C-alpha cells in the first residue's frame, strides 16, 4: 500500500490567528506564542530570587537588552557629543550712579552763524562777455583748394563665377559693379543691374530635391511574412473571398472597407458559413503575391480558440489565400545555331550525290599515330553542286544514303596533312679538340674501398 504523502502544516502564527477564537488550536501553539512554555515558567520562577539586570535573558532573540553585551574586563565606549561651538558672551558694562542715563547717539554738529559777512575775493573781475550785433550766419569753407576725382576700374574673367557657355571677351568700357566717384567730403555709388536666375518657382510640385543625393521617391516596404511556421496555411476556393470576405465568417452584412482590417464580434456559440473560418475574430488587409507560378490573393486571420478569465483571447494565426490565375512562362523564339547557306535563289532545293570515280581508297592515306584521336572525313560532290554547301562522309565499300533538302554550311576546319615519319638519330662519335679539358666529378671512376670485417677474437671484436 503506498504511503500517504505528508502535507506541511501552516506556520504557528497563521494557526494562532484562526484557531484562537474557535478554540481548535493544537496544544503547542498557544503556549509558544503566549510565552507560557515550561522554559518560560522556569525563568519566571527563577527571576524572583535572581536579578539578571538588563541582559534580556528569555525566549526572545538574544540581543543583550538595550545596552548590549559588554566584554568582561573592558569599559564601555563613551560617545562625546561636541555639538555647536559656543559663542563668546556679550559683555555689558555697568553704568554708575553719577553718569547720566541718556546716551548721545549723534555727535554735535558745528553751529553756522547766519549773520556772517560774505568773503571778499581779490584779483581780476572774471570773464569778459562780448556781444555782437551781426545777424548774418557764419559760413565755413571746408572745401579744399584743389578738387580730385578718383575712378577705379577693374575687369576680370573668372570661370568659377561665369558659365562656360556665355564666356565672352570683355568689351571696351566694361567695368566692375563698384565704381566710386567721390571728393574729399562727398561721394556717389554706381551700380550695374544683373539679372538673377530663379531656382525655385511657385508652380513647382514641391518634390524637388534639396540635396545633391536625394532619397528615392519609392521605398521598398517589407511585406508580411505569410509563409512562416507560425501561420496555418488554408486555401480558399470561394471567389467571394476576394470582394466580400466577411460573408464567409458571419451571416450579417456589416459595412466595412475591404482594404482595412475587419474585426468580428461573435456570440459564444456560432457556426460560420465556411467551416475554414471558424473562430476567426480578425482578418487583416489583403496582399497580392506571386508564388509557384500563380498570382495569389492573401489575408492573415486570427482565431480566438481560448479565452482567459481576464477576457484575453488566445488563438493561432491563419494565412488564407486564393489563387487568381497562373503566370504563363515567357516563350522565347529559338534561333538556329548555324547560319543558313547562301543560295542563288530563294527556296531552291537540289540533290547531292557522290562520284565513286573521283574518290580514292582510304588505304592510300597515312595511318594516324597511336595515342591520338584523329577523325578523317572524306567529302565529294558533283560538279553541278555548289562548292562547300554539303559534306557527306564516305567509307570504302559502303553505300552512303543521300537525301534531298536544304543544306547547312558547317564551320570549315582545316584538315591535317600527311604525316611523314622521322628516322631515329644514330649515335655518333664525339671529337674533342684542344689540349686541356676537365671531366665532371660524376664521370670519374674512383676505386671502391672494401671494408674489412674481423671474424676472430684476436682481431679485437666478434662480428654480430
UniProtKB/Swiss-Prot annotation:
Record InterPro entries: Late_L2
Q: What does this protein do?
A: Minor protein of the capsid that localizes along the inner surface of the virion, within the central cavities beneath the L1 pentamers. Plays a role in capsid stabilization through interaction with the major capsid protein L1. Once the virion enters the host cell, L2 escorts the genomic DNA into the nucleus by promoting escape from the endosomal compartments and traffic through the host Golgi network.
Q: Which GO terms describe its biological process?
A: microtubule-dependent intracellular transport of viral material towards nucleus; symbiont entry into host cell; viral penetration into host nucleus
- Family named by the database record: Belongs to the papillomaviridae L2 protein family.
Keyword Phosphoprotein among UniProt keywords: yes
Q: Where is this motif: Nuclear localization signal?
A: 1-10, 445-453
CC terms in the record's Gene Ontology section: host cell; host cell endosome; host cell Golgi apparatus; host cell nucleus; viral capsid
Q: How does it assemble?
A: Interacts with major capsid protein L1. Interacts with E2; this interaction inhibits E2 transcriptional activity but not the DNA replication function E2. Interacts with host GADD45GIP1. Interacts with host HSPA8; this interaction is required for L2 nuclear translocation. Interacts with host importins KPNB2 and KPNB3. Forms a complex with importin alpha2-beta1 heterodimers via interaction with the importin alpha2 adapter. Interacts with host DYNLT1; this interaction is essential for virus intracellular transport during entry.
- Protein name as it appears in the record: Minor capsid protein L2
Extract the Pfam families matched here: Late_protein_L2
| Sorted UniProt keywords | Capsid protein, Cytoplasmic inwards viral transport, Disulfide bond, DNA-binding, Host endosome, Host Golgi apparatus, Host nucleus, Host-virus interaction, Late protein, Microtubular inwards viral transport, Phosphoprotein, Viral penetration into host nucleus, Virion, Virus entry into host cell
For this protein, what is any one GO molecular function term?
DNA binding
Give the subcellular location: Virion; Host nucleus; Host early endosome; Host Golgi apparatus
After translation, the protein is modified as follows: Highly phosphorylated.
Which superkingdom does the taxonomy of this entry point to? Viruses
Which cysteines are disulphide-bonded? 19-25
Q: Does the keyword Phosphoprotein apply?
A: yes
Amino acid at each position: 500500500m503506498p504511503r500517504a504523502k505528508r502535507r506541511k502544516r501552516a506556520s504557528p502564527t497563521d494557526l494562532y490567528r484562526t484557531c484562537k477564537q474557535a478554540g481548535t488550536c493544537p496544544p503547542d501553539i498557544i503556549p509558544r506564542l503566549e510565552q507560557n512554555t515550561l522554559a518560560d515558567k522556569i525563568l519566571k520562577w527563577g527571576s524572583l530570587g535572581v536579578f539578571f539586570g538588563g541582559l534580556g535573558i528569555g525566549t526572545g532573540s538574544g540581543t543583550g537588552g538595550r545596552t548590549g553585551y559588554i566584554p568582561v574586563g573592558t569599559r564601555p565606549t563613551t560617545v562625546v557629543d561636541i555639538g555647536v561651538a559656543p559663542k563668546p558672551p556679550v559683555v555689558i558694562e555697568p553704568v554708575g550712579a553719577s553718569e547720566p542715563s541718556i546716551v548721545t547717539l549723534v555727535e554735535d554738529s558745528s553751529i553756522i552763524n547766519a549773520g556772517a559777512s560774505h568773503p571778499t575775493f581779490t584779483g581780476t573781475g572774471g570773464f569778459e562777455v562780448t556781444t555782437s550785433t551781426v545777424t548774418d550766419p557764419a559760413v565755413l569753407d571746408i572745401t579744399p583748394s584743389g578738387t580730385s576725382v578718383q575712378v577705379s576700374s577693374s575687369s576680370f574673367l573668372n570661370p568659377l563665377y561665369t558659365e562656360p557657355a556665355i564666356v565672352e571677351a570683355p568689351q571696351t568700357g566694361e567695368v566692375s559693379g563698384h565704381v566710386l566717384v567721390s571728393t574729399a567730403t562727398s561721394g556717389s555709388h554706381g551700380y550695374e543691374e544683373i539679372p538673377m536666375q530663379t531656382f525655385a518657382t511657385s508652380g513647382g510640385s514641391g518634390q524637388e530635391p534639396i540635396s545633391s543625393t536625394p532619397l528615392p521617391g519609392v521605398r521598398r516596404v517589407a511585406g508580411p511574412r505569410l509563409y512562416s511556421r507560425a501561420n496555418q496555411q488554408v486555401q480558399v476556393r470561394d471567389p467571394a473571398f476576394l470582394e466580400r470576405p466577411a460573408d464567409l465568417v458571419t451571416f450579417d452584412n456589416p459595412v466595412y472597407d475591404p482594404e482595412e482590417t475587419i474585426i468580428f464580434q461573435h456570440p459564444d456559440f456560432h457556426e460560420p458559413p465556411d467551416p475554414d473560418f471558424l473562430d476567426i475574430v480578425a482578418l487583416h488587409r489583403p496582399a497580392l503575391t506571386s508564388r509557384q507560378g500563380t498570382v495569389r490573393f492573401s489575408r492573415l486571420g486570427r482565431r480566438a480558440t481560448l479565452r482567459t478569465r481576464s477576457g484575453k483571447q488566445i488563438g493561432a494565426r491563419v494565412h488564407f489565400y486564393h489563387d487568381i490565375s497562373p503566370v504563363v512562362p515567357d516563350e522565347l523564339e529559338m534561333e538556329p545555331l548555324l547560319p543558313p547557306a547562301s543560295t542563288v535563289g530563294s527556296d531552291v532545293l537540289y540533290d547531292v550525290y557522290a562520284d565513286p570515280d573521283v574518290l580514292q581508297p582510304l588505304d592510300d592515306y597515312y595511318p594516324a599515330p597511336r595515342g591520338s584521336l584523329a577523325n578523317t572525313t572524306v567529302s565529294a560532290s558533283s560538279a553541278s553542286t555548289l562548292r562547300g554547301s554539303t559534306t557527306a562522309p564516305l567509307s570504302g565499300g559502303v553505300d552512303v544514303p543521300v537525301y534531298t533538302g536544304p543544306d547547312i554550311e558547317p564551320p570549315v576546319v582545316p584538315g591535317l596533312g600527311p604525316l611523314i615519319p622521322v628516322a631515329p638519330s644514330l649515335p655518333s662519335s664525339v671529337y674533342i679538340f684542344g689540349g686541356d679539358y676537365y671531366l665532371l666529378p660524376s664521370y670519374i671512376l674512383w676505386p671502391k674501398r672494401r671494408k674489412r670485417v674481423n671474424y676472430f677474437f684476436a682481431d679485437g671484436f666478434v662480428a654480430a
